Amino acid sequence: KYGQRKNARRGWGDVGKNLVLIGCGGALYVLVELCYRGRSHGSMFLLGGVCFWLIGLLDEVFPNAPLGVQMALGAWGIVCMEFLTGLVVNRWLRLGVWDYSAQPHNLLGQVCLPFAAWWAVLAGAAVILDDLLRFALFGEAFALPRLF
């Protein structure tokens, strides 16, 4: 699978592919939030999309990493991005998009340990969904990630 992503189907430049993947990831994350919280925010579309795209790049950086490793790395990336976005959106701009202050093991109310576990689950789904989208939309190789 590694190395087979380049130029699989002509017509999509790297920027176009990235924007499509960010858009798909952002839309899916907003849908997850709407199902879970009943509301979302425009900043979550951007954050969810960028996190989805970054998780998709794990195959490029760690081509032989098992799914569990990709899930852990994806969760770590999401937590970092969520913390930085929270500092800007919630603390600096005071938009109040989310507040984990009441959750155990939180950091400034922007991230918390219980949600980090859920991010690992979502990251696992994102790893597989990214490969499926790349296969369906761009004709790239598809193989399920190995578990161990």
Where are these regions (language model features)?
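Aromatic-rich, lipid-facing transmembrane alpha helices and their immediate juxtamembrane interface loops
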Residues: 3-148
